[in-house]
């Protein structure tokens, strides 16, 4: 979130700047009169901020609770990828309750109404939630990187490894948020004004630039570089294996041209060029979450760097609206997960007719799977001459054996009947 902070400059009077200290929206406190010691807000813009914050808070709570409900409903079958999604939803809920909600209340009251301890805690929690959400996303990308690029080492994974990565994300968020609790405190907005707020005075002025760059590197640039490396490696590995599979297929067709004449051969559907569909789906899911993260946060950090070199951007309504995109990230992550896992949504549908439809779809899928397996077996039998001759030989042998057994079993019965008939006639 953002809160206006005063920076002591060389000019006679101080001025208020919007600066990123939370997870979503900056407040619009600024001086209309440079000779005034009290900031005046743009109330129209504040109302827009409050409306957007309230909407984002509601959507973040509802959407992430839906994801948690789906995952907890399937808690006995939760896979490693879903564990990361579970904690990402928890992080987004922390963003909603400890970042968006305090900022919403703060915008309504204009001044922070709690004490110094609560001021430091809220500021710490706001940054903690942001770091946690970001670094859980990074650990998810690292896990997909190991699964795709290093499959042999990935074979030995245990649930403990997943929990270790999640613990690392929590530890990084805990440590990186400490400066926020040190800098902010309840103090006078302007010395001698008698107005107290959860505030920070950056003295000298270069401390503000240093802290802004610290947040930029820790929360955006370094995570983006890690995400680019992991997904660049994943894309290259998938492309290389796809190319190798195509080359191998061409070589096989060149060496054994008669195989190209086979009919009725159905390819396996649970894997694509050595990767399972579930693994590829998890890669697509993580990639979508990362792209959304970049889209939501890039305008904010670009504006922050711009603000460091151009102070006239402060109070610009257009810039504030652009910065509102950052809070959408906690709302969009659940949508992405549910879109990529539509079959899980039916697990929590309360309507019996919808559940019946789910069962019918599952039965149809199972029938198609079984029929596909039978067709595949039949195609293998009909496409191989050796199998055809072997199956015919076995069936002929069984038919001859059955006739022999029938003749052997029917002969004594016929003889016995003849004896009985002869006895009666005599």
From Swiss-Prot:
GO terms for biological process: cellular response to hormone stimulus; G protein-coupled receptor signaling pathway; positive regulation of hormone secretion. Gene3D superfamilies: Rhodopsin 7-helix transmembrane proteins. GO terms for cellular component: membrane; plasma membrane. It comes from the Eukaryota. Residues 373-426 are annotated as: Disordered. Residues 1-51, 106-120, 187-208, 310-319 are extracellular. InterPro entries: GPCR_Rhodpsn, GPCR_Rhodpsn_7TM, Vasoprsn_rcpt. Keywords: Cell membrane, Disulfide bond, G-protein coupled receptor, Glycoprotein, Membrane, Receptor, Transducer, Transmembrane, Transmembrane helix. Belongs to the G-protein coupled receptor 1 family. Vasopressin/oxytocin receptor subfamily. This is Cephalotocin receptor 2. The lineage of its organism: Eukaryota, Metazoa, Spiralia, Lophotrochozoa, Mollusca.
